[in-house]
Amino acid sequence: MTILMATDKPAERPQPKRSRKERREDSIEQILDAAEYLFSKHGIYGVTLKDVAQRVGVHTSLMHYYFADKQALFVEVFERRATVTRARRIEALDAYERACDGRPTVEGALHAFLDTDLDLYISGGEGWRNWGALGGQLSNTDYGAELMDKHFDPVVMRLIDLLRRAMPDMAEEDIFWGYHFVTGSLLLTLARTGRIDKLSNGLCHSDDFEAVKARMARFMAAGFREFAATSGAKDSEG
C-alpha cells in the first residue's frame, strides 16, 4: 500500500500547448510594447528595428517577418491605442450630449473630451503613458499629423459641434483658437517633460494626471468664457 505523505505534491497537469496563432499574437504584442517605449523616448527617427529587436530579445529577421519596415511598425504602434481612445471619446461625447438634454455647456463638453482620455493615463498603466508621450511628439511631424488627422479629426469636430451649441454667438475663429489651446495643453501634458517638477521645486509633477484632470477642463472653460465676455457671446451656463 502506497502512503501519500503530506509533503507530496500531486502531479501537475501539463499546460495545453499554445497555438501558433497565440504565439504569434504574443510576439507581436511584445514587439509593439517595446517599440512604443522606445518611440516615446527617442521618436521614430531615433529608433531602429534592431533597437526594438534587442529590447524584446529576438532576432531582427523576426521584425521584418511581422513588419515591412519601421514606418509600418510605427503606424501599428500608434493605431493600436488610437482606435481605443478615439472610440472612448466619441462614446463620452455622445453620452454627454444625451445627458445634457440639448443644453451643452463648455465645461461639460470639455470634461467629456478630456477626462475620458486622462482616465486612460491614470489607470491604464505605463503602456498608455508611453503612448501618450509619443502622441505629444507627433504634431510636429508630417507622418504624425497625417495619423492625427485620420484618427482624431472626427472626435475634434464632435467637440467643436458641442462648443458651438454651448456658445452659439461666439465667433467661429474663437472656438477654433480655444480648441487649439486645449489640445496644445493636453499634448504638452502627455509629453511628461518634467519641467513643471523643476519649476515648482517638486510641488507639481508632470505625470500627475489626476491633478491635471481636476484642473484642465475648468481652466480651459474659463478661457472660453473670457472669449465670450469680450465678444458679447453667452455660454448656456449663463
Explain the meaning of each model-derived region.
Residues 1-14, 123, 153-238:
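C-terminal peripheral helix-coil segments that are non-catalytic and often amphipathic
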Residues 24, 28-36:
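Short, leucine-enriched amphipathic alpha-helices that occur as contiguous helical runs
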Residues 30, 38-80:
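Helix-turn-helix
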Residues 78, 92-93, 120-121, 125-147, ...:
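N-terminal/domain-start segments enriched in small and hydrophobic, helix-friendly residues
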Residues 90-127:
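Hydrophobic alpha-helical connector segments
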Residues 108, 127-133, 142-167:
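Amphipathic alpha-helical packing segments from all-alpha helical-bundle domains
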